Amino acid sequence: MAAAEAEVVSPLIVDTAPDTSGTAEASVAASVAEAARTESQAPASKAALAAKLMSLSGVFAVHKPKGPTSAELLNRLKEKLLAEAGMPSPEWNKRQKQTLKVGHGGTLDSAAQGVLVVGIGRGTKMLTSMLSGSKRYITIGELGKATDTLDSTGKVTEEKPYDKITREDIEGILQKFTGNIMQVPPLYSALKKDGQRLSTLMKKGKVVEARPARPVTVHSISLLKFQPPFFTLDVECGGGFYIRSLVSDIGKELSSCASVLELTRTKQGPFTLAQHALPEDRWTIDDIEQSLERCTSLLPEELTFKKLKSDNSSDQVISCGYITLRDTKREDDAVKTL
């Protein structure tokens, strides 16, 4: 009986609704239907991504390449996340006093690369705790050449012989730069005078006096490679330490001069370049969410955002400028929030 009914119904269906599959009309209808489905689903998907993005809190690490400043990299990260979530531009958000709050702790020079610790949401409140922690660097120094910036980006100010310097000579003086020592910071730095960075004043041709030596800590230094005029060091140090000053001082101690050719931060606090720093192609909401779980779990419990008092109103307002630790005023001891 069912078969008979099917035979009766089938002709009726064919007669009243002719098969248009494969025709132009069918293709147009399918495209319109798909567009309608996509349009109805997209806002919901973007809204969910935006909600997830604004709920993120904690600290994670990114891989800063050579070229951009730490602040420029932070802006690039922020723009990528806002674009993925379909949120308005940062400029619009500033006017509305609602924005994604991100910050970094521990500046890297534009010519340097490596681990940059980033805080997001309430995680920006944890960044000051990262400043006094240990950092590790691999640097390549060049003997016989001094520059005004103490690295390869500057103007050559002095050249001296280096041909008699041996590996043993370098290894023999490293102990002098280990432990609690005094260090004079570079003139080209983020340290300030009358509210302006020393580097900005130098670029304007202003006369800037050398800053006094200040106490810093070096946990360890080892010479990895020596191929004159280049030498490679592995340095673990505390906050406020300048690798550029170290390399320059080593050159002077060897009766020559030296400047930094390359600088890579391989570790900051518990975060390493190899295991934790996200490259730019992984700056996505999902990747950062996973990284937050992994990285925040490495911090001492008293530093996690779960222990911080929540202030939802302040979390939604952009905070610009530097927050400086009370007991010091060093370039690395500043938290940049955007």
Swiss-Prot record:
One of its GO terms (molecular function) is pre-miRNA binding. The keyword GTP-binding does not apply. GO terms for biological process: mRNA processing; mRNA pseudouridine synthesis; positive regulation of pre-miRNA processing; tRNA modification. InterPro entries: PsdUridine_synth_cat_dom_sf, PsdUridine_synth_N, tRNA_psdUridine_synth_TruB. Its EC number is 5.4.99.-, 5.4.99.25. It comes from the Eukaryota. It is found in: Nucleus; Cytoplasm, Cytosol. The keyword tRNA processing applies. Pfam families: TruB_N. The modification N-acetylalanine is found at A2. It catalyses: a uridine in mRNA = a pseudouridine in mRNA; a uridine in tRNA = a pseudouridine in tRNA; uridine(55) in tRNA = pseudouridine(55) in tRNA. The active site is at D109 (nucleophile). GO terms for cellular component: cytosol; nucleus. Keywords: Acetylation, Cytoplasm, Isomerase, mRNA processing, Nucleus, tRNA processing. PANTHER family: PSEUDOURIDYLATE SYNTHASE TRUB1 (PTHR13767:SF2), TRNA-PSEUDOURIDINE SYNTHASE (PTHR13767). Pseudouridine synthase that catalyzes pseudouridylation of mRNAs and tRNAs. Mediates pseudouridylation of mRNAs with the consensus sequence 5'-GUUCNANNC-3', harboring a stem-loop structure. Constitutes the major pseudouridine synthase acting on mRNAs. Also catalyzes pseudouridylation of some tRNAs, including synthesis of pseudouridine(55) from uracil-55, in the psi GC loop of a subset of tRNAs. Promotes the processing of pri-let-7 microRNAs (pri-miRNAs) independently of its RNA pseudouridylate synthase activity. Belongs to the pseudouridine synthase TruB family. This is Pseudouridylate synthase TRUB1. The gene is Trub1.
